[in-house]
Amino acid sequence: MRHGNVPERVELLVIGAGLAGLACARRAHDEGIDVLVLDAADAVGGRIRTDVIDGFRLDRGFQVLLTAYDELHAQVDLDSLDLRAFKPGSTIWNGRSLETLGDPFRNPSAALASARARVGSLDDKLRVARLRRRLLASPAEDAFEGPERSTLDELRAEGFSEAFIDQFFRPFLGGVFLERDLETSASLFRYYFRCFAAGDAAVPAEGMQRLPEAMAEPLEGRILLETSARTISDGQVTLDDGSTIAAGQIVLAADAHAAAELGGTSPPDFKPTITSYYSARSAPVTEALLVLDGEGSGPANHVGVMSHVSSAYAPAGQHLIAVSGVGEAAQDAASFPKAAQAQLTRWFGPEVERWDHIKTYEIPYALPRHPAGFTEHRPPRRAANGAWLAGDYTDFGAIQGALRSGRTIAESLMQHLAEVPQ
């Protein structure tokens, strides 16, 4: 899949080998369309990449896939990913102690401890149960049919206390939305909340990059890496080396900013995140649970011991710890690693000082912003130069959104081809 001989013409040229581009190319390829995928990077995946450093598997930013995503089941052989799941629930630093909120519906033995956990009130926890039951009673897409308001307004309307919102929802959803102000559309809150209730948060045993690699396997020989597109004009793509490819249809599935430059569109606003990885001889917690900053002091928002989720993430005898920040903390890579360790010393004790920093990933364009009403302001399906647009920013910022955008664009362009006289 490296840079090779560039054909003069293809039926479909997909620019970008992230999830959206791969989903589009696979759907078209399955229908017998002659497709070629270009990407400037040295591997498929887009924002979903995994680096191996001294035996540690470092995803480029903390990432998980939710097994409740229906596009995953439709497009990927999940058994081939050897998925390893986080334990349902989370551990929360409330400013004084670490408290664990389990999922009593999926782990009944956690019910008593969760009820006693000093996070929110019993009424808050009963409201979570009622909300869970209500959302699971309807199809996932119904989440987008409810009131259009911010997540914060939704939580208040549901009757949750401010203390529970601050201690649980802000850090938990902060890790999902990459913002703790909870300005993200309530429709996405309802959708994600249902997904977490209906399935697992998981990673492939050998790192998140296994997902795009598995998607790329049926496209062997149809992907050119380290190949950049410079311009698009009149159904022709000019590459950085000056060569050209004519294409019957062109799909821009590159990252939103590159797509905007090639397509002449305006890029959407994005949210940043940052993840520092550390190695340690002993883990700060004993289970594969996310640990959340319910105090709100930062800079770390959530912590995951990846070696508890999959032993392949770290060499034998070592643990890999992922520490992530959002908002302002995500924009200060120079100070984040040490500041996060200082913060986590309060949570876990002096052992944190002996963690060895491996690498920090600063990701300025991690997720598109989706405020209330975002579905009414999605980008057009085609750019002014005729290229089709695919990517999570055209649907919603998630693996589900990326996969669905790629598939639906492939189906739209195939319908277009069927309707246009040849």
Residue ranges and their predicted role:
Residues P7, R230-S335, W347:
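Mid-domain catalytic core of redox enzymes
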Residues R190-L239, I245:
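Helical element adjacent to the flavin cofactor pocket in flavoenzyme catalytic cores
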Residues R49-A68, R130-A143:
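Glycine-rich active-site loop/strand segments that organize a redox cofactor
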Residues R2-N5, A312-Q422:
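Conserved flavin/dinucleotide-binding core of flavoenzymes
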Residues Q63-D70, F144-P147, E158, R194-A216, ...:
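Short beta-strand to alpha-helix junction loop
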Residues H29-I53:
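Glycine-rich FAD pyrophosphate-binding loop
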Residues E11-V37:
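N-terminal Rossmann-like FAD-binding beta1-loop-alpha1 element of flavoenzymes
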Residues L72-H73, D82-L182, A197:
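Mobile amphipathic helical/loop "lid" adjacent to a hydrophobic cofactor/ligand pocket
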